[in-house]
């Protein structure tokens, strides 16, 4: 074999080197900027056996059933972070029982957070006056639909919220939110 002389070997010129350096830098910045966007669409990993997400308090701490039941009386409806971080009401059904379903607190009219009015025993939207009964069924408009439901389960004292796919027990219809 013959060796090529150094003058016959093509070298990388300054312009080509700068082009490669610029391309690499722009690609790195673009991938770095896209990471949070892609990460947004990946579901959270903290899940129960049913594929739900861990219910969290207003500070983002995981909720334990014993802790929740010790600080909330029977019949209480209090907000937690549920599916996709949406505000969801956990229902205390007894001194040692959290309800098997949660109620999404987002109004079906314009998306306001609907507070629980314990005096009237219903959810009342402050934005346009929609009202929902204790189960989240719409009783007065302008909201067109009942509040969405979520399954609630307790496993090893951890509270999990998962997608509701069963028939809506309030209307007998398929869930509109699934």
UniProtKB/Swiss-Prot annotation:
Its EC number is 7.1.1.6. Its cofactor is [2Fe-2S] cluster. It is an enzyme of class 7 (translocase). Keywords: 2Fe-2S, Disulfide bond, Electron transport, Iron, Iron-sulfur, Membrane, Metal-binding, Thylakoid, Translocase, Transmembrane, Transmembrane helix, Transport. Its main location: membrane. Disulfide bonds join 112-127. The keyword Nucleotidyltransferase does not apply. Component of the cytochrome b6-f complex, which mediates electron transfer between photosystem II (PSII) and photosystem I (PSI), cyclic electron flow around PSI, and state transitions. The 4 large subunits of the cytochrome b6-f complex are cytochrome b6, subunit IV (17 kDa polypeptide, PetD), cytochrome f and the Rieske protein, while the 4 small subunits are PetG, PetL, PetM and PetN. The complex functions as a dimer. The Rieske iron-sulfur protein is a high potential 2Fe-2S protein. This is Cytochrome b6-f complex iron-sulfur subunit.
